[in-house]
Curated annotation (Swiss-Prot):
Function text: Cell wall formation.
Name this protein carries in UniProt: UDP-N-acetylmuramate--L-alanine ligase
InterPro entries: Mur-like_cat_sf (IPR036565), Mur_ligase_C (IPR004101), Mur_ligase_C_dom_sf (IPR036615), Mur_ligase_cen (IPR013221), Mur_ligase_N (IPR000713), MurCDEF_pg_biosynth (IPR050061), UDP-N-AcMur_Ala_ligase_MurC (IPR005758)
Organism: Paraburkholderia phytofirmans (strain DSM 17436 / LMG 22146 / PsJN)
Entry's Gene Ontology cellular component terms: cytoplasm
């Protein structure tokens, strides 16, 4: 074909969603270029793989491209988008490009408001342990692979399905997982929860007649859509009607021990190298898929026991010195987490309590988006009130305009009125290390949490407190 696509350009290539697709395309032999406002470890990795990276957005960056990939975060007046439109170069939404990758293999798409990244990583790890060598595209760095994407030689591609902009409706996988359905990104759905649930129903309708929907029946909203799912279903969770069900669940030494009861297979004893009952649910989804694909029980057990986690999902940085007057006076345990919705945060706090019983829990939290802070304000107050000490920053806007009474200071005031925790408020994440040093004690567990720039803080804490 004269117009065959050889060169694909990514606008915003340094993001986790875009970079994973770019890496797979590089490994498939395509010429890949991309731009972003700043360089980071992701862009450095892609450059080392052979992608051409430009820092800053400019029309000349798309020179020679046959297609330009954009995410919903890219503005329509971006100079590269304008240049592509002027030159009649196809502008391809990220989800459409992911759908094209899925057409090359059998797709396994992981959807849900919470837990997508961890569940996708668990599924990919279990299939890899079973010798299926899957391709994966994950919204976080799989620590064992050192990357958020990999091109495998097997028949399957495992990827996250993003409901935040309804782009998951572009995908046509053969296996789907829905972990849960919660009120988030409601602007996309006109603040109508029924529309959000309908989108998930439509997502299941993308399955072929031989496809399977793997659904967490512990979630009441997932349970409500069951009658509208027309394809075969595997139910998982703690619920009595789950076909893949966890029993005898115990937390020990930061790990979860349980037995997975399976409707069409023998029970299997699991040691999961992650804390928290929510991660037991995530592991059950992986067990359900692995069982369906005839992965051996020993391989399932090994993959879950050896799972090293995902970057910024309860990522442990180890012991960090408590420094006083230039001298170490004990140490605290540092954990970093991407949680930014009250439901996710509550699960992480519960996991920390289970993993570190009896220890004081200190949270440094950066709220993400003014709209989410407004929509979930009371739930934020409730979950933030459950920690022992709190450092709270201003909201990371993610491009949104401020909303009155939905900022960090408003949250701090509401927390003081609630009276269960006295927040230390700081305007920027740059102030977090000093604020933490004033409240942290020997033996504490410190969690840095949020989806914004606070992700850079734990590395600083680990470095700056060396003595």
């Amino acid at each position: 074909m004269k117009h065959i696509v050889k060169h694909i350009h990514f606008v915003g290539i340094g993001g986790v969603g875009m970079s994973g697709i770019a890496e797979v395309l590089v490994n498939l032999g395509y010429q890949v270029s991309g731009s972003d406002l700043t360089s980071n470890a992701i862009t450095d990795r892609l450059a080392a793989l052979g992608a051409r990276i430009a820092i800053g957005h400019a029309a000349e960056n798309i020179e020679g491209a046959n297609a330009v990939v954009v995410s919903t975060a890219v503005r329509s007046d971006n100079p590269e988008v304008l240049a592509a439109r002027h030159r009649r170069i196809p502008i391809v939404p990220r989800a459409v490009m992911l759908a094209e990758l899925m057409r090359l293999k059998q797709g396994i798409a992981i959807a849900g408001t919470h837990g997508k990244t961890t569940t996708t990583s668990l599924v990919a790890s279990v299939l890899a342990a079973g010798g299926l060598d899957p391709t994966f595209v994950i919204g976080g760095r799989l620590i064992s692979a050192g990357a958020n994407a990999r091109l495998g030689t097997g028949d399957f591609i495992v990827a996250e399905a993003d409901e935040s902009d309804a782009s998951f409706l572009n995908l046509f996988p053969v296996i789907e997982v829905i972990t849960n359905i919660d009120a988030d990104h409601m602007d996309t759905y006109g603040h109508d929860f029924a529309r959000l649930k309908q989108a998930f129903i439509e997502f299941t309708h993308r399955l072929p007649f031989y496809g399977i929907a793997v659904l967490c029946v512990d979630d009441p909203n997932v349970k409500e859509i069951l009658p509208f799912v027309s394809k075969p279903i595997i139910r998982y969770g703690f619920a009595p009607d789950a076909q893949v069900r966890a029993v005898n669940v115990k937390a020990h030494d930061g790990k979860m021990h349980f037995t997975a009861m399976r409707e069409d297979a023998a029970p299997i004893d699991i040691v999961l190298n992650l804390p928290g009952e929510h991660n037991v649910q995530n592991a059950l989804a992986a067990i359900a898929i692995a069982t369906e694909l005839e992965v051996k029980d020993a391989d399932i057990q090994r993959a879950l026991a050896d799972f090293n986690g995902v970057g910024r999902r309860f990522q442990r940085y180890g012991e960090v010195p408590v420094v006083s007057e230039g001298k170490a006076s004990g140490a605290y345990t540092l954990v970093d987490d991407y949680g930014h919705h009250p439901v996710e945060m509550a699960a992480t706090v519960a996991a920390a309590r289970g993993a570190f019983p009896g220890r004081r829990l200190v949270l440094a939290f950066q709220p993400h988006r003014f709209t989410r802070t407004r929509d979930c304000f009371e739930d934020f107050v409730k979950v933030l009130s459950t920690v022992d000490a709190l450092v709270l920053t201003e909201v990371y806007s993610a491009g949104e305009s401020p909303i009155v009474a939905a900022d960090g200071r408003a949250l701090a005031r509401a927390l003081r009125v609630a009276g269960k925790v006295e927040p230390v408020f700081v305007d920027t994440v740059d102030e977090v290390p000093d604020a933490l040093s004033a409240v942290v004690r020997d033996g504490d567990v410190v969690i840095t949490m949020g989806a914004g720039s606070i992700g850079g803080v734990p590395g600083r804490l680990a470095q700056e407190t060396k003595v």
